[in-house]
Amino acid sequence: MTNRIKSSNTLLTFDANEVTNIKLVWDIEELKNKDNKENKDKENKAHIKDEGEEEEQKEKKEEEEKEDDGGPISFHPTYSHQIFNEDKIQGYEPCKIDIYMGAGSLTSYIDTNYTLQSKNLTNVEGEFLKVFSKQDPPISKQSFYKYIEEKEKLFKPIGKKIHEYSIIDKESGKETEYEIYFGRITDQVVFRYHEKLQIFVLWYIDGSSYIWTDDPNWDIFFIFEKRIIDGEKRYGITGYSTIYNFYHHPEQTRARISQYLILPPYQRMGHGKYLFNSIYQYYKTNDGFYGPIYDITIEDPADEFNLLRNYVDLKNIMDEKLFDNVILDLNANNKSVFEEIRKKLLIPYKQSKLCLEIYLFSKFLGTPNSDTKYKEYRISIKKRLYKQNIGDSEQIEKIKQQVAEENQENLRLEQEELQELQDIENKKNGTNIKVDIKPKELTTPPGPEKNKEEIEKDRLEEILELYKELEKNYHKTLSSLNLISK
């Protein structure tokens, strides 16, 4: 029987996210199980007789991959455009990239069938080396296997332990323990570990970039999973957050959450709230870079993060009963309540007001739309949405107008300069030629301009859509807090 190995000489373009597999390795047994499975797959492939059987084997393999085969935890990146242009890799079939990392140490090894046969191919290893740790770059397969077998078990969490918790799997009933650690970037151990860890923000936070680690104002919180393997404690990274310390007059610190990531295998399990609360608890009793923490803010939060933040903040406010004496009116003066929330919970004024919005929403559920108080509540929120969103578009229109005026002025100056040159020629030749520079025509003719009433109507429709989306999110938060039925 002749062995059949499917290959292609055609240069293809692959989605970098689909062909890249990130694998977290806890011990050498996982690598041995992986190797055994790969050898078995090769044997099966060698005995394939026709395309129908090949397709059958492919489907079987996909089903097996869904099951726990004793190999490393494996998952794909979400974004690769900061590593590979437009998330694309050029190469030949088959194209597969496996990035192995020690679950705790993050010692790495890149395994690829990729061979540099043509200058047209993407230099995968070269592109990864640009973004991986410079102090601890990927090592060879042989060195990686040896490291996992001999040294991975020696890894201990980075920083100072500040919290521990456990999560019980709803299906299996298995309880897993986790620990949260704090560290400052000025600690060289923290600095070096973070340099290996930060690749994950490129893979999972759109538009992210590496933080400037030469700046001493960075704090980092880590979550580690704890396992017992062969009677010994082992640790693996679960998630982390970077915090920047800003100065706040006179001798305080305003902490800002910059990056916040729970790795894909651990998402939707509740780790986000544990990490967030640990950040709050730490800064309540520990100074920041410039002194006591004034409040904790967020840098450009994504929608999902806002849901988490609203849940955590509102729950903490209600647990402390800080809304018990609040005036149930968004237009009322609740500054003293918001100030008490800031001092006790480090929640900023603006976020406290948003939590009050959600809290009041729960009070109005089931209330007729015609109710005066409920009507005032809805109008107040829509005014806020209008100011936040339409105000921005008005600013854009002003900028566009300024650019148009500047272009017109530049055109006038250019025409004057050319006319001066033409006047010299006119004097020589006895002519009277006038320079007339016309603006470049638009490639696409503009559509009919809308009048003010039509523009305002469009804006109000936009606000109504935003309000509907906001109500959905408030429902989610209140359901999570068991304040309304799901």
Curated annotation (Swiss-Prot):
The UniProt entry, under InterPro entries, shows:
Acyl_CoA_acyltransferase, GNAT_dom, Hat1_N, Hat1_N_sf, Hist_AcTrfase_B-typ_cat-su
Cite the EC number.
2.3.1.48
Q: Which GO terms describe its biological process?
A: subtelomeric heterochromatin formation
Give an example GO molecular function. histone H4 acetyltransferase activity
Q: Where along the chain is acetyl-CoA bound?
A: Y260, L261, I262, Q267, R268, M269, G270, H271, G272, K273
Q: Which residues form the N-acetyltransferase domain?
A: 189-386
Residue runs in coiled coils: 27-69, 392-481
Family designation: Belongs to the HAT1 family.
Annotated protein name in UniProt = Histone acetyltransferase type B catalytic subunit DDB_G0274269
User: Where does this protein come from, organism-wise?
Assistant: Dictyostelium discoideum
